[in-house]
């Protein structure tokens, strides 16, 4: 087994339709991609273009393909694509002070799952993700097939300290939800209606949840209606949207 030269911060599984593929990222600035073959794990790709710690990696939903996004302290985001047993990559600046997290959107736009589709070819699956940075901002990125690059479609501002984590809710129903966790001891839940242009920051509203400690991670349930929050107080709290649109803590798990 090959080894990283520093602490391993994150591991992430690709969708099983692409095989048994695992990615790892490290303080050493490298990303390894592994595949199980004949009962043995083999490193099939190494990405070395980041110049600082790779803090978080995330595979895209399977519909747009096999894409791995990585957030690095060097201020850049990379997207590695696995297609026809070959790898390609893109790397671009995202947050000048460092990128701490990345999270893919659902492959369907909000409302597509429940609305009637016109006859003909279905809409192309989305290749879109959110990043959180040490510049206190959340940024949204969308793949542009014309330029074959990722465009910054929106900047969400409101935190007053580093954004440690972002999580895009997997539900594509009637709204888009993004949760952001910050060193400012708050979580913001950003909401955009299905009918609105999510590339316009004014269409996003945020609900602020306040805590007594730094917040490290946020994670949505698979159904996208429960948010788990963990922070420096060694607690995990579960939050759910009420019928009135507020967010209530429904359970707290303590160490």
Label for each model-derived stretch:
Residues 11, 31-36, 57, 77-82, ...:
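WD40-repeat beta-propellers
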Residues 7-9, 18-21, 43, 53, ...:
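WD40/WD-repeat beta-propeller blade-loop signature
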Residues 12-19, 58-65, 84-85, 103-126, ...:
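Loop/turn segments within WD40 beta-propeller blades
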Residues 24-28, 70-74, 131-136, 180-185, ...:
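Conserved strand-to-loop turn within each blade of WD40 beta-propeller repeats
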Residues 161-194:
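Loop/turn-rich, solvent-exposed surfaces of beta-rich toroidal or solenoidal domains
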Residues 1-8, 47-54, 92-99, 105-106, ...:
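WD40/WD-repeat beta-propeller blade N-cap
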Residues 35-39, 82-84, 142-148, 191-200, ...:
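Short loop/turn segments immediately following beta-strands, especially the blade-tip
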Residues 203-255:
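C-terminal interaction modules of eukaryotic adaptor/scaffold proteins
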């Amino acid at each position: 087994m090959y080894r990283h030269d520093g602490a391993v911060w994150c591991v992430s599984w690709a969708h099983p339709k692409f095989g048994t593929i695992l990615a790892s990222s490290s303080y050493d600035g490298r990303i390894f991609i592994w595949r199980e073959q004949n009962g043995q794990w083999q490193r099939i790709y190494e990405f070395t273009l980041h110049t600082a710690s790779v803090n978080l990696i995330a595979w895209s939903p399977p519909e747009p393909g096999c894409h791995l996004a990585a957030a690095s302290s060097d201020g850049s985001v990379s997207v590695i694509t696995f297609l026809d047993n070959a790898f390609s990559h893109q790397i671009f600046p995202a947050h000048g002070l460092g990128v701490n997290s990345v999270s893919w959107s659902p492959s369907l736009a909000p409302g597509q799952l429940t609305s009637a589709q016109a006859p003909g070819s279905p809409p192309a699956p989305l290749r879109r993700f959110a990043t959180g940075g040490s510049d206190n901002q959340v940024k949204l990125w969308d793949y542009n097939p014309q330029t074959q690059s990722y465009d910054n479609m929106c900047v969400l501002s409101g935190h007053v300290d580093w954004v440690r984590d972002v999580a895009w809710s997997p539900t594509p129903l009637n709204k888009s939800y993004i949760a952001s966790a910050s060193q400012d001891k708050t979580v913001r839940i950003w909401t955009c209606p299905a009918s609105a242009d999510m590339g316009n920051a004014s269409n996003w509203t945020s609900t602020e949840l306040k805590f007594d400690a730094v917040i490290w991670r946020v994670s949505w349930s698979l159904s996208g209606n429960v948010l788990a929050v963990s922070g420096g107080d060694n607690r995990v709290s579960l939050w759910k949207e009420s019928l009135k649109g507020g967010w209530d803590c429904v359970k707290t798990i303590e160490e």
